[in-house]
């Protein structure tokens, strides 16, 4: 309840401080920096450190008094060590230097940075004639003077000006305050830093930053105060400071409103401080002095808070992919002060200053609802079609494809290409299909490379019309011959001209009309005189080929030339396929023709103009006059004195260049055409460069693979490459032989054709007879049926074989009911591809399974390592716990010995008592009762032997856990016992302290009677009386301090007695409850024992049950021991409470007697108590 009320009181202050920090700079409250830090204070000279020393001071007008300084012991009454200047040292304590030592310094060396606000010094003796205060903010490396102080600045510091400083480097001298008797009775010096720099134009925050930060402070006494001499013995010259206050706080750069203890700081009374060391930082700052931005708040540079501007550190923007960042000044300057944080250790495959882009070979995940861990996914480029080593687009994921490859993953060949392989630098190779007979959008299948023919076009390359069709050159497929069935010799027409073979007396393309006596197609002239062959390329002609009269070739649209073998202007591609160019070419060509016409007209007009007797064109004359005026203007500009020679030369050079350009202007169409071809040349060069780059990367990868592999693998690779090269060479040689054979066959066929055409009557009957024989034999229908797998009924001979041979569209697969060699071969090929794909999938699945097995092995190894590490930690923790118990018992014994030592004073007893009572015990008897209930619950679950046998393992584990918890409760009970023993020791020590107080009072009474008898002697002999009075004063001060401490201790012990009585009553009630619980446990245990006795032959299970029983008996014994100890503790508390009440009654009477003695002594020794 008490912490709740403290929180309620502190909460408004905390909220107010946070609001103050939210409005701008904020600073912690000030306190005395010296309290609790006297160990950091040192003096260059201290009296009585090695041996006692005597110093004399002026007393009254003509007298002097001399006192002793003995600083060998820190708490001696005559000790004047430097730690006495702290405000916590109490009255009648001061620091004093040795006599006649000059200069002397007091220096404070702190271990952290603090903010100093004010320095206050009170002097015990004469004020110094000259001194200076300086500070260091880098732990003593460099020093800067705050201010010079002197009784006479002109003589003490002649080179230092007086007044207020006007800049940070301006240091002035301030006169010391002059008061009556200041040289004899001391004085006070106060230095406020804000008042010191009040004349400097700067904000409050800037002043604190500039002069408030300290790590070291030094006060240098440079000149002793002049003391006038009285009689033959001069007074002693020394420096003495009774109190030094350093008001300040922890130094937080305006980013904190309170301070906290540093980690691991001791909380003892001797080290209690008013000002803690570490700042509780605000504004997203961190560090002991808030000197840097907190982690992940580095988006702007750190700056001290100033006035209303907190200069709050801003959080870095890493898009959720990092928790660490750093500040980069270059980035901050490039963003013009907008941001400067650079993220570190980007996760999820991201990179960049803000983890805003994907890493190389990763791209942005565009799937809706993707988690932040799936922001970037790996590129899915096909290694066969993508450029090796080239990353995909980080936004779209588009891979960089080879020249003849397309698709987002580079897994498809472009139209007209097939055979995607990794070894091909261009990815795919061009289909070997006839451009006239194949489809325009997709000439071939991209996987198999099979040509896709137009309607009625056949052949592996789509280069032949189907039987009874012609006109392959149309590009739309072949058309039926449509020969007249009565007038033609055969339904098959010429594939190129469509001319049907007509019967005698009939003519025309389809033999549909009677023959006209004129030269046949592709000839011209007169039939009577003889027909001559047309000199034309019939692939580019139409109709009869040429004019029957003149022989001029009749070109198809888009073709030109004497033989119709050239593409007409406006048509592109190569002959015989001439297609209309892009519409932009027509526009460009029209513009060129218009410009050519205009140029011709201009040339004709100019020639007629200069050939006449004079210039008749008035417009031309006006233009010439205009040119002359411009030339005059140019001359005027050139003659202007404001123009330099360099500018004139530049203008002249420009005019000369323009004149040359005008003179060289002419219509240069070839240059324009060359310019238009430059983009194509650049594209060709780019493709060549990409091919070379791909080849280089492939060779490099092969080299790296070979260099990283073993020599046997490299040898196998070389052998494979050699075999592939040999096979390729063999194929080339076979192709060469096949081409030679085809060439010979073609020549032989041409020779036979010529012979047949020019043989006259001898050859014709033989050819007719051969044709008649081949029209019936051999019959190829069974062969084609076996080959194609169909049931053809029509006869097929070498002369006539109508219809399609294989109606399955160029030999495609026909499914599971295939018959014939060709369909089954196609089906087998497809099945082989499917099996290969299944094998690749099976291989990938094997790889994934292998990875899963490896991951499982690694997980098992990690679990085993974790178990071993946990076992080691448990063993170490047990050893550490046993060592802590041993050290705790040793400490309790040491404290007990220290408190029972008769030489220990009451103040030390009080400090130890406070420290012991301040300890917080984490447990009480309620914990013991809880463990009893758990043991009882276990006993309740044990009566059924069959259930015990089935759950032996779980019960053993649960028993071991409860055993550990019981051991922990036992340790806590020992701690409670130690606390009670400490309380008893405190009571005994209180008794000893009371006895010492009675002895001291008796000694004081004897000293008082001695003083009353020797008053006359004291007036005659001064020095012995002074020594005696000094001794009595010291004893009186010690006695009064001890009595105050004993009074406080008595009150506290009374309250503790009441609390102990309440605790004893509660412990008694819990003990009774625990006793009842143990009675129930005894009953359950007896029943369990009976059942276990009945099942003595249970083998291994019985042994386990016996082990559980033994552990339960041990727990029961330990619990009974704890109950006995609790009873003993209750008795000790009762006896201690009674002893405290008796001692309190005795202290009441002694307090009155002490007050009477104090008043009497103060009245008698008032004259002698003058040594301050």
Curated annotation (Swiss-Prot):
CDD domains reported for this sequence: cc_LAMB3_C, EGF_Lam
Secretion signal span: 1-17
A Pfam entry, by short name: EGF_laminin
SMART domains in alphabetical order: EGF_Lam, LamNT
Consequence when changing residue 199 to A: In JEB1A; somatic second-site mutation
Gene3D superfamilies on file: Galactose-binding domain-like, Laminin, Tie2 ligand-binding domain superfamily
Subcellular location: Secreted, Extracellular space, Extracellular matrix, Basement membrane
Disulfide bond annotation, renumbered to this chain: 250-259, 252-279, 281-290, 293-313, 316-325, 318-343, 346-355, 358-376, 379-392, 381-399, 401-410, 413-428, 431-444, 433-451, 453-462, 465-478, 481-493, 483-500, 502-511, 519-531, 534-546, 536-553, 555-564, 567-578
Region described as Domain I: 817-1170
Limits of the Laminin EGF-like domain: 250-315, 316-378, 379-430, 431-480, 481-533, 534-580
One GO BP: brown fat cell differentiation
Coiled coil stretches, renumbered: 723-757, 831-884, 948-1133
Residue positions the entry lists as glycosylated: 220, 604, 810
InterPro entries associated with the record: EGF-like_dom, LAMB1-4_helical, Laminin/Netrin_ECM, Laminin_N, LE_dom, LMN_ATRN_NET-like_EGF
Segments of this protein annotated with the region Domain II: 579-785
Tissue specificity comment: Found in the basement membranes (major component).
Primary location group: secreted
Domain Laminin N-terminal positions: 22-249
GO cellular component, one term: laminin-5 complex
Result, substituting residue 450 to C: In a colorectal cancer sample; somatic mutation
Chain segments annotated as transmembrane: none
Entry domain remark: The alpha-helical domains I and II are thought to interact with other laminin chains to form a coiled coil structure. Domain VI is globular.
Disease per record: Epidermolysis bullosa, junctional 1B, severe: A form of epidermolysis bullosa, a genodermatosis characterized by recurrent blistering, fragility of the skin and mucosal epithelia, and erosions caused by minor mechanical trauma. Junctional epidermolysis bullosa is characterized by blistering that occurs at the level of the lamina lucida in the skin basement membrane. JEB1B is an autosomal recessive, severe form characterized by bullous lesions appearing at birth, and extensive denudation of skin and mucous membranes that may be hemorrhagic.
Protein name: Laminin subunit beta-3
Organism: Homo sapiens (Human)
Upper lineage: Eukaryota, Metazoa, Chordata, Craniata, Vertebrata
Gene that this sequence comes from: LAMB3
């Amino acid at each position: 309840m008490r912490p709740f009320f403290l929180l309620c009181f502190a909460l408004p202050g905390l909220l107010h401080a946070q609001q103050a920090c939210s409005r701008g700079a904020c600073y912690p409250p000030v306190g005395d920096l010296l309290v609790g830090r006297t160990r950091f204070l040192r003096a260059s000279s201290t009296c009585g450190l090695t041996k006692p020393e005597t110093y004399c001071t002026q007393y009254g007008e003509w007298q002097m008094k001399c006192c002793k300084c003995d600083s060998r012991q820190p708490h001696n009454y005559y000790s004047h060590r430097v730690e006495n200047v702290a405000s916590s040292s109490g009255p009648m304590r001061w620091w004093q230097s040795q006599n006649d030592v000059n200069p002397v310094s007091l220096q404070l060396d702190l271990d952290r940075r603090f903010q100093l606000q004010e320095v206050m010094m009170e002097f015990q003796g004469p004020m110094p004639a000259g001194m200076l205060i300086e500070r260091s903010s880098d732990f003593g490396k460099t020093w800067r003077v705050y201010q010079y102080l002197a009784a006479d600045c002109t003589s003490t510091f002649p080179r230092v000006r007086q007044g207020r400083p006007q800049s940070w480097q301006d240091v002035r001298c301030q006169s010391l305050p002059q008061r009556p008797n200041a040289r004899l009775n001391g004085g006070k010096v106060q230095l406020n830093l804000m008042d010191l720099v009040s004349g400097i134009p700067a904000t409050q925050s800037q002043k604190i930053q500039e002069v408030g930060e300290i790590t070291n402070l030094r006060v240098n006494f440079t000149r002793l105060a002049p003391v006038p001499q009285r009689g033959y013995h001069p007074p002693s010259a020394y420096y003495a400071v009774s109190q030094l206050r350093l008001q300040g706080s922890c130094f937080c750069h305006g980013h904190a409103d309170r301070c906290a203890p540093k980690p691991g700081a001791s909380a003892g009374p001797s080290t209690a401080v008013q000002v803690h060391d570490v700042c509780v930082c605000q504004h997203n700052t961190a560090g002991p002095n808030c000197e840097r931005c907190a982690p992940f708040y580095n988006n702007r540079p750190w700056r001290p808070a100033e006035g209303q501007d907190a200069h709050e550190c801003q959080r870095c923007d890493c898009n959720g992919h990092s928790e660490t960042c750093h500040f980069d000044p270059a980035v901050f300057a490039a963003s013009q002060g907008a941001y400067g944080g650079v993220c570190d250790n980007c996760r999820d495959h991201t990179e960049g200053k803000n983890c805003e882009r994907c890493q190389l070979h990763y791209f942005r995940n565009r799937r809706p609802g993707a988690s932040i861990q799936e922001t970037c996914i790996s590129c899915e480029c096909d290694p066969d079609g993508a450029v090796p080593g080239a990353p995909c687009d980080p936004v779209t994921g588009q891979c960089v494809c080879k020249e003849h490859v397309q698709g987002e993953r580079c897994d498809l060949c472009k139209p007209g290409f097939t055979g995607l392989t990794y070894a091909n630098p261009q990815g795919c190779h061009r289909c070997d299909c006839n451009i006239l007979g194949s489809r325009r959008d997709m000439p071939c299948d991209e996987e198999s490379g099979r040509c896709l023919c137009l309607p009625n076009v056949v052949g592996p390359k789509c280069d032949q019309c189907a039987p009874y069709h012609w006109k392959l050159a149309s590009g739309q497929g072949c058309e039926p011959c449509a020969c007249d069935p009565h007038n033609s010799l055969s339904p098959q027409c010429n594939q190129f001209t469509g001319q049907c073979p007509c019967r005698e007396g009939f003519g025309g393309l389809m033999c549909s009309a009677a023959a006209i006596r004129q030269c046949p197609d592709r000839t011209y002239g007169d039939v009577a005189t003889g027909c001559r062959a047309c000199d034309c390329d019939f692939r580019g002609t139409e109709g009869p080929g040429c004019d029957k009269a003149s022989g001029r070739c009749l070109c198809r649209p888009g073709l030109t030339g004497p033989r119709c073998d050239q593409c007409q202007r406006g048509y592109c591609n190569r002959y015989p396929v001439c297609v209309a160019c892009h519409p932009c070419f027509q526009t460009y060509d029209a513009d060129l023709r218009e410009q050519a016409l205009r140029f011709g007209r201009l040339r004709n007009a100019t020639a007629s103009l200069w050939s006449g007797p004079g210039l008749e064109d008035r417009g031309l004359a006006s233009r010439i006059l205009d040119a002359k005026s411009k030339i005059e203007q140019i001359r005027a500009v050139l003659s202007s004195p404001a123009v330099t020679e360099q500018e004139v030369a530049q203008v002249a050079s420009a005019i000369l260049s323009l004149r040359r350009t005008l003179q060289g202007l002419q219509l240069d169409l070839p240059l324009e055409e060359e310019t238009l071809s430059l983009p194509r040349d650049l594209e060709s060069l780019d493709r060549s460069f990409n091919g070379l780059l791909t080849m280089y990367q492939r060779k490099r990868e092969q080299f790296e693979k070979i260099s990283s592999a073993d020599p046997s693998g490299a040898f196998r690779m070389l052998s494979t490459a050699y075999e592939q090269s040999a096979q390729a060479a063999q194929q080339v040689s076979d192709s060469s032989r096949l081409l030679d054979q085809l060439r010979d066959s073609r020549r032989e066929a041409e020779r036979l054709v010529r012979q047949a055409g020019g043989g006259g009557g001898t050859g014709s009957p033989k050819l007719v007879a051969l044709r008649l024989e081949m029209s019936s034999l051999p019959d190829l229908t069974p062969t084609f049926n076996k080959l194609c797998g169909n049931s053809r009924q029509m006869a097929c001979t070498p002369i006539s074989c109508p219809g399609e041979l294989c109606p399955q569209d160029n030999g495609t697969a026909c499914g599971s009911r295939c018959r014939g060699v060709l369909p089954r071969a196609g089906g087998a090929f497809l099945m082989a591809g499917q099996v290969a794909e299944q094998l690749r999938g099976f291989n990938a699945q094997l790889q994934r399974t292998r990875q899963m097995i490896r991951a499982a092995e690694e997980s098992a190894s990690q679990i085993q390592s974790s178990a071993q590490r946990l076992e080691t930690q448990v063993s170490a923790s047990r050893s550490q716990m046993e060592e802590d118990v041993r050290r705790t018992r040793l400490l309790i014994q040491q404290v007990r010995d220290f408190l029972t030592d008769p030489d220990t004073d009451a103040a030390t007893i009080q400090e130890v008592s406070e420290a012991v009572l301040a300890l917080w015990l984490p447990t009480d008897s309620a914990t013991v009762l809880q463990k009893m209930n758990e043991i009882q619950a276990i006993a309740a679950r044990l009566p059924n032997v069959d259930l015990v046998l089935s759950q032996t393992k779980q019960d053993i584990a649960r028993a071991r856990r409860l055993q550990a918890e019981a051991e922990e409760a036992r340790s806590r009970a020992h701690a409670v016992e130690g606390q009670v023993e400490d309380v008893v020791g405190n009571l005994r020590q209180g008794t000893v302290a009371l006895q010492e107080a009675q002895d001291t009072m008796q000694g004081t009474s004897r000293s008082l009677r001695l003083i009353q008898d020797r008053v006359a002697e004291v007036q005659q002999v001064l020095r012995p009386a002074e020594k005696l009075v000094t001794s009595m004063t010291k004893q009186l001060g010690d006695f009064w301090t001890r009595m105050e401490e004993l009074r406080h201790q008595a009150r506290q012990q009374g309250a503790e007695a009441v609390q102990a009585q309440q605790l004893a009553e509660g412990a008694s009630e819990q003990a009774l409850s625990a006793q009842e619980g143990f009675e129930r446990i005894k009953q359950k245990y007896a029943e369990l024992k009976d059942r276990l006795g009945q099942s003595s032959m249970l083998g291994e299970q019985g042994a386990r049950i016996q082990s559980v029983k033994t552990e339960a008996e041990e727990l029961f014994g330990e619990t009974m021991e704890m109950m006995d100890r609790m009873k003993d503790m209750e008795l000790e508390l009762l006896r201690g409470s009674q002893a405290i009440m008796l001692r309190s009654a005795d202290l009441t009477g002694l307090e009155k007697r002490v007050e009477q003695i104090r008043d009497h002594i103060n009245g008698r020794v008032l004259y002698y108590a003058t040594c301050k």
